[in-house]
């Protein structure tokens, strides 16, 4: 080993690495360094082994957390007088020095720094700090994890501090999280503990079932048709000549009909095709408009209208016929509906019997016959 370093174990290997061939100095650290717990470095300093500390490596390192103790070897915690415990943090005289028991409780030392309190009736707790108040008397009635509060027993009544999702005097009621109807589009709300979930109908998704699933995402339409999304459905806007749900059908081309001999159902309406008029018979094309058929059928009289028209016509005809019959009957009896209609007796006969009654359709005073002009005030008109 070089003379410039004295190492006693592998911990001082650094001394070897830093050693030189120079002779030892007069102020060699071996005279004051505890070589049992360290070694001398080339610079004359004392390098301590692990677990030792101090200028000369004379002091052991205590256990971490040791409060009222010392050590003889590294990582020890030897308690001083009056202290106990693994970390020497327990006061053996706690019952006399600190009086930890409250409300008249008696402190009893158990050794090793431990103690317990003998509480007076009506009090409890490690230090007799709690009174047997409403919570204890009621048997701690708060449910579902609720905390009973009574100001450590000194309150007149207790209160329950409920966890989220519960309510009531004893936290016994589960709050209905579906009360505000958070689920949309007819979804079913399932209540939980401080939460809810939505059971979405087909075609919707999301936490609140507000997302309409795109039924066109799979591109169901064929023939290059445009897809229009709906609620749990879709429509295909097929190009001309194609049909079906996904435009999978090829529609037959319509055959033009002749003007002379049109072949069509009796309920169809034939509409001349737009464009210039044909120059010869049979050269024009006809177009069958289904919309026009429906429109004309809708604009016709319904069954109820026809029945009302027949009834009204029958009543009118019966009224006219009754009027005519009554008029003829009165005429045959020589009675006008509005009064006498014959000339006075002095012109034709001494009485009204067997006289010919002439009914005038002219205003009063107009001559009824060129041979017999009426006398003033003698003609009676209907």
Curated annotation (Swiss-Prot):
Membrane topology type: Single-pass type I membrane protein
Matching SMART domains: EGF, EGF_CA
GO CC, alphabetical: membrane
Entries under CDD domains matching the protein: EGF_CA
Carbohydrate-modified residues: 157
GO annotation terms (biological process): negative regulation of Notch signaling pathway; regulation of fat cell differentiation
InterPro entries in UniProt: EGF-like_Ca-bd_dom, EGF-like_CS, EGF-like_dom, EGF-type_Asp/Asn_hydroxyl_site, EGF_Ca-bd_CS, Notch_Cell-Fate_Det
A molecular-function term among this protein's GO annotations: identical protein binding
Stretches assigned to the Extracellular side: 27-305
Identification of the protein by name: Protein delta homolog 2
Domain EGF-like positions: 27-58, 62-89, 91-129, 131-172, 174-210, 212-248
Record function comment: Regulates adipogenesis.
Tissue expression remark: Detected in a number of tissues including lung, brain, adrenal gland, testis, adult liver, placenta, ovary and thymus. Not detected in fetal liver or in adult spleen, muscle and heart.
Localisation: Membrane
Pfam family, one: hEGF
Primary subcellular site in the record, as a coarse category: membrane
Cytoplasmic compartment segments: 327-382
Membrane-spanning segments: 306-326
Signal peptide residues on this chain, from the entry's feature table: 1-26
UniProt xrefs under PANTHER family: CRUMBS FAMILY MEMBER, DELTA-LIKE PROTEIN
Keywords: Calcium, Disulfide bond, EGF-like domain, Glycoprotein, Membrane, Repeat, Signal, Transmembrane, Transmembrane helix
Disulfide bonds: 29-40, 33-46, 48-57, 66-71, 79-88, 95-107, 101-117, 119-128, 135-148, 142-160, 162-171, 178-189, 183-198, 200-209, 216-227, 221-236, 238-247
């Amino acid at each position: 080993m070089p003379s410039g370093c004295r190492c006693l174990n592998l911990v001082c290997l650094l001394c070897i690495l830093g050693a030189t061939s120079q002779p030892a100095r007069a102020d060699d650290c071996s005279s004051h360094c505890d070589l049992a717990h360290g070694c001398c470095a080339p610079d004359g300093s004392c390098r301590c082994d692990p677990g030792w500390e101090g200028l000369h490596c004379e002091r052991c390192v205590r256990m971490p957390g040791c409060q009222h103790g010392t050590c003889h070897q590294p990582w020890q915690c030897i308690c001083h007088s009056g202290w106990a415990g693994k970390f020497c943090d327990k006061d053996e005289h706690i019952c006399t020095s600190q009086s930890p028991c409250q409300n008249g409780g008696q402190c009893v030392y158990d050794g090793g720094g431990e103690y317990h309190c003998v509480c007076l009736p009506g009090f409890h707790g490690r230090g007799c700090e709690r009174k047997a108040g409403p919570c204890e008397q009621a048997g701690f009635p708060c449910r579902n994890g609720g905390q009973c509060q009574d100001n450590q027993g000194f309150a007149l009544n207790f209160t329950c501090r409920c966890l989220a999702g519960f309510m009531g005097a004893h936290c016994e009621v589960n709050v209905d999280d579906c009360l505000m109807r958070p689920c949309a589009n007819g979804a079913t709300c399932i209540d939980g503990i401080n939460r809810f979930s939505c059971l979405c109908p087909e075609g919707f998704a999301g936490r609140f079932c507000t997302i309409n699933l795109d039924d066109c995402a799979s591109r169901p339409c064929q023939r290059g048709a445009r897809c229009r999304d709906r609620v749990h459905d879709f429509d295909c806007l097929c190009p001309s000549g194609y049909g079906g749900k996904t435009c999978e059908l090829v529609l037959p081309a319509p055959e033009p009909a002749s003007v002379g001999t049109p072949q069509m159902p009796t309920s169809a309406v034939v509409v001349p095709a737009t464009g210039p008029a044909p120059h010869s018979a049979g050269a024009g094309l006809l177009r069958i408009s289904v919309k026009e058929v429906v429109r004309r059928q809708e604009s016709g009289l319904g069954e109820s209208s026809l029945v009302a028209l027949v009834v009204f016509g029958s009543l009118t005809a019966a009224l006219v016929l009754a009027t005519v019959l009554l008029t003829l009957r009165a005429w045959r009896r020589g009675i006008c509906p509005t009064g006498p209609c014959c000339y006075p007796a002095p012109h034709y006969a001494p009485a009204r019997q067997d006289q010919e009654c002439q009914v005038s359709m002219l205003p009063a005073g107009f001559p009824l016959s060129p041979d017999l002009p009426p006398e003033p005030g003698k003609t009676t008109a209907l």
